Structure formats: C-alpha cells, structure tokens
Amino acid sequence: MSFRKPPIRLATQVGGKEIIFETGYMATQANGSLTVQCGGTIVLVTVCSQPLESDKGFFPLTVEYSEKMYAAGRIPGSFFRREIGRPSERETLISRLIDRPIRPMFPKGLAEDVQILANVISSDQENESDILAVTGASAAVMLSSLPFECAIAAGRIGRLNGQFVLNPTINEIELSDLNIVFAASSEAVVMVEGEANVVEEEIIIEALEWGHKEIQPIITLQNKIQELAGRNKIPFVPVEENIVFSKKVEELADKFGIVEAMQVKEKQFRKEARKAVKEKVLAILKEDPLYAEHSDILNTVSEIIGNLEKKIVRQRIVKENLRIDGRDTITVRPIAIEVGLLPRTHGSALFTRGETQSLCITTLGSSTDNQRVDSLAGDTVKNFMLHYNFPPFSVGEVKPVRVSRREIGHGALAEKALKYILPSQNTFPFTVRIVAETLESNGSSSMAAICGGCLSLMDAGVPISAPVAGVAMGLIKEDDQFIVLTDIIGDEDAFGDMDFKIAGTTKGITAVQMDIKITGLTTDVMRKAMEQAREARIHILSEMAKALDVPRSNLSQYAPQHAELVVNPDAIRMIIGPGGKNIKQITTVTGAAIDINDSGKISIFAPTSEAMEQAKQMILYYDQRPELGKNYKGKVRKILEIGAILEIMPNVEAFVHISQLAVEHIAQVTDVVQLGEDMIIKVIEITGDRVRASRKAVLLEEEGITWTPEESSRFSKGNRNGDRSRHNNRERTRRT
C-alpha cells in the first residue's frame, strides 16, 4: 500500500500500438514529469526551471537525452562499469531532435532557465525511444507550470512494400526505404528529420500528410493528461516595448544608413557596416540625458536594431523580390569546384557556393577501420562516416575549438544524404570516411558538405550509384503570403521563418531536415519548397558534373590495396598460428589488415601493391596443396617400422614407404632416414587428404633413369602386398 496519490495513467492506440502516459508515479518533485511507454520501451521525461537572475540575450533551454545500459539488461563496457564521459553521438542527435520542435513553443522573452531531461529506463530493443522522448518532452512541459504554446507529438514514418508504416520497429526501419521523424501540433508539422533511398518529393509530402493525421490521438492524450494533472501555469507578461525609445533608435539607425548596410552583398563588409550603424546610434543615445543613465534601456538597442534589420530584409523580398545579396528568390549563388587538389589524400574536393566553402576529403580504410557503436540495441558496425567541422575562423571569430552538438548534427545529416549512393560491402569492402572542413560560412554549410563530400567520393574512385547535391530553402511568411527562398545565406536563415535542407539525386530525395520559427507549416508550403529545391538541386548537380561527372576508374595510388583469397578452411588454423603468431607476423611484416572468414574467404587490405603481394604469398605458404609428380623438400617428423612421415608443407604430411626410401633394398628405415632430417621426395599418389611420396623416384631421376607414376605405384603395391605376407607369416607362427 502506497502513501502517495495513485498515479494517472492514460493510453491511446496509434499505428496499431498502444502509447501510455503515466504521471504522479516517478520524479514527482520535478516541475513536470511523466513516463511514455510503447511496448517494453519506457522513457522518463522531466522538466525543471528556475528564474533567470539576469537577461542572457537568449532562451536558456537545456535538453539532455540519455540511454542507460540497464534499460536493455546490460552492463556498460567502460572500466568503471558505469555511464561516464560525454554523451554518445546518438544521445547528442536525439537531444537536438527534442530541442528543435520544443524551443519555438516557449513564449519569446520567458525569463526562466529550463532543463528537460529524457532518460530511457527500459528498452525492448524493438520500439525506438527517440520519438517517445520528443513526445514526452512536450507532455512534461504541458504538465509543468511553464507557459507553452501547444502540445506537439512526434512520429516516425517508414515505408514497406509501398505502404506507409507509423512508428516501425527497429527491424522494420532496416527494411524501409523511408525513415522520417517528424513533430507536429494539431494544426501543422513543425519539424522534420529523415532519410530516404532516393524517394520522390511527392511521396515525402504524402508521408507527412498521412503521419500528421495518424498522431492526432497523442496530442489529444497530452491535452487530457494536462487537464487531469497539470500545474497552474505561471503568468507570463511580455516585456512591454518602449515605443518612444524604439522609434528613436529606428530613426537614428535609418539616418546612419541601416537600409544601405543591409544591402551590402559581402558578409564581412555588411557586418562591419551594421556594427558602425549600431555604434553611431549608441554614441548619440549615451549623450542624451533621457537615456544616458539607463543602461537597461541602452541594452535593448541591439535587439531593436536587429528587429529593424529583419523588417528591412523581409520587406525588400516581399515588395521587390530582391534579397540581401541582390539575388531573386530562386537563384542559386555562384558555384566554384576543384577536385583532386590534395595530392596525398585518397580523394578531395573544394566546393564553394557564394561565401560558403567546404573542403571535403575522402579516406578509404580496411574493415578494421570501421566504427563499432555500442547502444541499447546492441553493438553495430558503421562502414561509412562523415565528420563535419566548423572552425571559428570560418566566420571570422575567435572561439574555443571543440566538437559541438551542431557539428555532430550537421555531419549526421550529410552522412544520411550520401549513405544510399554508396556501393555495397560485397562489391566495395572498404571503410569510407569523409571529413568536411568548413573553411568559410555564410549559410548552408552542411549542404556544401554534401556536395563536396560527394565529389570527394568520386575523386577517390568510389563507385557511387549517382551524384547527390543539397540545398537549403528558406521562407518569408507575411500574413497569408509566403515566399520560398532558394539557397539561403546566414542572415536569411536568421531573419526568415524556415530552414528546410533537402538533399538528393536527380531522381529523388536522400535526406531532409526542416526547422521553423512559426507555429506550423502547411503541406502546400512544403510542396512549393521541395519543387523549388529540386530545380536548384538539378542546377547544382550540373555544375558538379562539369568538374567530375563520373567516379574515377581507379583508386588513388595511396589508397589501400584490396584483394580476396579463398583457402582451404583446414588451413585457417595454420594461417593464424598458435596464439595468433603467424597472422601477427604477416600483418607486422607487410602492414596489411587481414580479415579471415571461417569459410576460408580471406580479405586483405595492404598499403601498397608490393605489400599486398607479399601478404598473399605469406598466407598461401600455409595453404599450399601438393601436386602429383612434383618434388618437395620435406622434413622427417616421424619414423615408423614400414616407412617415414615427412612434412612437405605447412599442415601437409606425406608418407614414404620403406620400399620408396632408396633404390636398393634396406632392412630398416633408420638405415637411410633420421628424425628431423631434410630430404627431397616426389609425390606419387594423392587420395583425399592422404599423400604418398617416393625418395626412390627422385634418386632414379638423378641417375638419368626415367621415372613414371606407374612404376612407383607398382613398387608401392608390391611392397604393400609383401608387408601383408610377412604379417600373415607372423600370425601363422603365433597360431602354431
């Protein structure tokens, strides 16, 4: 019997699966908390907040998603046997997945430090936890006292045999040609993240329309649980604008040329012009006795000028169809491409679009270079990786150099875009790594990484199925009017209402990512954005084809050499050697990476062609097979009464009958043979794994006497009969 109030438990059916919300059971001291369950997967989501002591200039929302190994009945493999260190890449990506649709739902100006924690406490390794975490984050905030615009729910859309599937299992995702995670309110889609195996744009739109309808019961469930268990919302009063002061700032900014500053095409020059306007405005205001002593008012100058800049940019687009850099709404920035510019890399490309530049390098490695990922679903192996770097110099800034969440997210998106065009491991067994170094950035740097990454793959000679390009689309929405922008720059991203990244081939989509700053996006807007993006993508692909239209026919001379051998499975033991002695010697001497399959298939990666040939010979040494009529140098391993056993190859022994040890008759084997002695013998018979040899045949040939297999066979058979006669005589003697 519990002293607590009974928990509130609600459930609904979505996509043929039961989704369960339960609150008032765990983590009740949090501002808002609940568990979200599907099958045996349970995610505990909590939200806490505290008032801000001072305005930070941004909304301090922290989202952390974590997977605990106990959830899948496993113990962490770290030295301390606990989850320590920084979050995994998957945890980071899902944290971003939660943050992106949740953040816009908080009111602007909320003076609260908010932390959302999502912990996977049970995993059936069948139902994915990421969409439960996104939905749970929304529900937890709905239950809390924090103001929140509306409930959102997340879902995953797959496609099997041409049919959409909502929230497919982990195994079904592997078979699906579509894997789209989306979040939506009751009115519209607010976030999209996904990948596809070259799927047409209209199918993506249909999937989102279908998925939006399917997840409505989850939104209804959130509203219901809020009614039953939600806290009273804290009153939120937006900071009242000082209209008189704002008007004065705008007039001064206009006087000092803010309109002209926002028409400067070059990013850095525009930045300097805007800074100069702001400094002039502040200088005047600091001399005004009405404001000189009010630092709190002066601190709002940047925000006021920023809002004015946003208004100027948007109005120019709406009224004049002109953007900051002078383009219309559908034009892609000028493109410059260079491939093969780094002589010692396996593949390289420098992709420049406007003031955004990405240097992409492809490196090929062996199967031992793949990445092993430890997760709740078990250990998986990645043979393709794309790492995106965004150093501070790319935007002319000074900042600490470390891998940020943003870099991990952009790299994951670019990786999704390119993974479907790579050849299978059966035809191209290399591990492939792309590094995208952002050297300059003025928007769409992740899309530049996709374009440059594809070109570097082609320069490396990777036989991709089709080239891929990416482009970022923006949106300006004023009342009922909307304008889609092609290939947005950084300021258009900041001042616009949408960032919709789309990558694909000429035939279809391979990756999408959409974030918006408004309450939702209709499918009509998404359809327009995708159609416009397709035209831009085809243009970009045509520019890429001018630099390199097909993958190079050969790999770089500096790339690893690859070959496959098939050996007798019985020889594997000898190739490996006791304690791995032989295989270690081969890899040490040649520098090769060797993967041995139990079936006898051996995959070899060597740094040079010479090393490859050496590795082959060293492996084949242990897999030699005797040939009939061929001479071999053997070592005497065992002496028997009727002959000797010699090792003629690794793991291959031959029996030499006493009658075949010498030309003349000998009474005992030891008359001509000693243990450990080397001698040349000829293979005269092979029956299965049994090998018979003759020293006598070698001696006869040395004397110039022609030897034939029949002759040795006759001697062999005769002597075997003679042996049986002597054996039978001994038996008769014992009987008498």
Swiss-Prot record:
Residues 629-703 form the S1 motif domain. Pfam families: KH_1 (PF00013), PNPase (PF03726), RNase_PH (PF01138), RNase_PH_C (PF03725), S1 (PF00575). CDD domains: KH-I_PNPase, RNase_PH_PNPase_1, RNase_PH_PNPase_2. It catalyses: RNA(n+1) + phosphate = RNA(n) + a ribonucleoside 5'-diphosphate. One of its GO terms (cellular component) is cytosol. Belongs to the polyribonucleotide nucleotidyltransferase family. This is Polyribonucleotide nucleotidyltransferase. It comes from Lawsonia intracellularis (strain PHE/MN1-00).
